[in-house]
């Protein structure tokens, strides 16, 4: 990457505001796109793609609105939508990257547009949780075959922070009590079979030159996986853990910490990401088009009997 571009982006990230004609601009009406994914099994009865409602609540709880991004959206519509929203969220899930080329084509297009926006001084954040975290790493490497297997489903642990965490954008604004909770209490919920190993990170220059590692964890078998990342020069962030689950999911077969400390710490991540999206000045030119795209046009279904992992699910066709 051109060194001048890197310097400019770094300054924007550090300052944390956008100036237009010398005036500081903050967008207090952010709209964030959440990517859908294909349904399978019993879920196909209700629609061909879905978003777990907990991700929507997670974004809304921090003061943003949500637009679903259909994973099979055409490139023209995606480009128009990306120019109107203020950030994108890649949720967790179970997509087989090697057998879902439409899905992977879409996340690659989103990634390319996010990088291009920011290279041009157009601040645009991207967040990935669980599978979304994995997607960020794989997209930076342009290789979907870098993940390792882990014994870390239904597994709630504290974070092992690296030396970079305290000075990172993601965690530098967190209170000492939140950092202490994250580091010492079992409040970060993991639910993944695959992950990014430190060895793969170290051996893959396209990943280790793009992302800093802010935390790691060890699975039940003693194998270390990377659990939090932050792009060095872009507003791109990822957690292998699920900050939305302790706040909004209640299945008693999943080990989730619903304590006050857990809620405060996990909610911090949403507050941080939405605040990043306030720095994006994209907007819809037509209010009626904006209204027609919002998640409010859809009704979530109570899903206890079909998919107990989620309290509610939004389905799409």
Swiss-Prot record:
EC number: 3.4.19.9
A Pfam family of this chain: Peptidase_C26
One GO molecular-function entry: gamma-glutamyl-peptidase activity
One GO process term, biological-process aspect: tetrahydrofolylpolyglutamate metabolic process
Enzyme class, first EC level, given as a word: hydrolase
Domain Gamma-glutamyl hydrolase: 23-317
Protein name from the UniProt record: Gamma-glutamyl hydrolase A
Alphabetic keyword roster: Glycoprotein, Hydrolase, Secreted, Signal
Keyword DNA damage: no
Catalytic activity: (6S)-5,6,7,8-tetrahydrofolyl-(gamma-L-Glu)(n) + (n-1) H2O = (6S)-5,6,7,8-tetrahydrofolate + (n-1) L-glutamate
Residues of this chain annotated as glycosylated in UniProt: 99, 154, 160, 257
Signal peptide residues on this chain, from the entry's feature table: 1-22
Family named by the database record: Belongs to the peptidase C26 family.
GO cellular component: extracellular space; vacuole
Active site: 130 (nucleophile), 242 (proton donor)
Locations listed in the record: Secreted, Extracellular space
């Amino acid at each position: 990457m051109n060194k001048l571009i890197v310097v400019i982006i770094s300054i924007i990230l550090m300052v944390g505001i956008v100036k237009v004609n010398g005036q500081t601009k903050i967008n207090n009406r952010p709209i964030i796109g959440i990517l859908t994914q294909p349904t399978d099994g019993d879920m196909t009865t209700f629609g061909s793609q879905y978003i777990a409602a907990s991700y929507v609540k997670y974004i809304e709880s921090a003061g943003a609105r949500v637009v679903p991004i259909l994973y099979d959206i055409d490139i023209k519509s995606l480009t128009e939508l990306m120019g109107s929203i203020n950030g994108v969220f890649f949720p967790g899930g179970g997509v087989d990257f090697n057998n879902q080329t439409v899905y992977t084509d879409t996340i690659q297009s989103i990634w390319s547009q996010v990088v291009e926006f920011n290279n041009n001084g157009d601040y645009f954040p991207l967040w990935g949780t669980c599978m979304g975290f994995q997607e960020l790493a794989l997209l930076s490497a342009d290789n979907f075959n870098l993940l390792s297997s882990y014994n870390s489903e239904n597994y709630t642990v504290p974070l092992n922070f690296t030396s970079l965490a305290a000075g990172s954008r993601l965690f530098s604004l967190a209170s000492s009590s939140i950092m202490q909770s994250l580091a010492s209490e079992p409040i970060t919920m993991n639910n993944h079979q695959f992950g990014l190993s430190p060895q793969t990170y170290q051996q893959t220059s396209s990943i280790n030159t793009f992302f800093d590692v802010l935390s790691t964890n060890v699975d039940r078998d003693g194998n270390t996986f990377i659990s939090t990342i932050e792009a060095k020069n872009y507003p791109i962030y990822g957690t292998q853990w699920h900050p939305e689950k302790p706040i909004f999911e209640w299945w008693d077969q999943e080990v989730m910490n619903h304590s006050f400390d857990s809620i405060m710490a996990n909610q911090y991540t949403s507050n941080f990401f939405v605040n990043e999206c306030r720095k994006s000045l994209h907007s819809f030119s037509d209010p009626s088009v904006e209204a027609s795209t919002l998640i409010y046009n859809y009704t979530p279904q109570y899903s206890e009997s079909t998919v107990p992992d989620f309290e509610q699910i939004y389905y799409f066709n």
